[in-house]
Design a protein with these regions (language model features):
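Short beta-strand scaffold segments in enzyme catalytic cores
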Residues: 23-31
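Zinc-dependent deaminase
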Residues: 1-15, 87-145
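Local cysteine-cluster metal-coordination motifs and their immediate loop/turn environment
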Residues: 73-92
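Short helix-loop-beta connector
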Residues: 65-69
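A short helix-loop-beta-strand connector motif used in the catalytic cores of GNAT acetyltransferases and
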Residues: 17-21
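A short, polar/charged loop-to-alpha-helix boundary motif
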Residues: 41-53
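Short beta->alpha transition motifs characteristic of CBS
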Residues: 34-41
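Glycine/small-residue-rich phosphate/adenosyl-binding loop
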Residues: 35, 52-61
Length: 145
């Protein structure tokens, strides 16, 4: 098991327990978690608080050199907005729990030379599959459909 993916899953579960969309993210620098977050669009009535955005916000202000040595983990493939933040800050590695229930613009990350690893983690797949089946309206709103 990957302890950083486990931490992202714990964030996703926290979001689900709070009535939100179960997507979690952690920002890793070296061997330490610098930021954690989960999707809070529902809980906070936000249009931008996806898991990766919440994670980056919770990491606080970091220098460009720090981001360029970081890895961001997400339980789900980053959307266009979150991909843009990853590109903006030059985060060189993205680890994705799963991209079966939603595939963001992974090709944009790869074209920019970012190392993208998709783990196809069954826990992430199950969490999202269940949520989407139970809450299709919330899910469609989250992905802009």
């Amino acid at each position: 098991m990957d302890r950083f993916l486990d931490a992202a899953i714990a964030e996703a579960e926290k979001g689900r327990a709070d009535g939100g969309i179960p997507i979690g993210s952690v920002l890793v620098i070296g061997d330490e978690i610098a930021g954690r977050g989960h999707n809070q669009r529902i809980q906070r009535g936000s249009v931008v608080l996806h898991a990766e955005m919440d994670c980056l916000e919770n990491a606080g202000r970091l220098s460009a050199s720090v981001y360029r040595n970081a890895t961001i983990y997400s339980t789900l493939s980053p959307c266009s907005m979150c991909t843009g933040a990853i590109l903006l800050y030059g985060i060189p590695q993205v680890v994705v729990g799963e991209n079966r229930t939603f595939q963001g613009p992974q090709h944009l990350l790869e074209q920019a030379g970012i190392d993208v690893k998709v783990l196809d983690d069954p826990r992430c797949i199950s969490m999202m599959t269940s949520f989407i089946a139970e809450n299709p309206e919330l899910w469609n709103e989250d992905i802009g459909e």
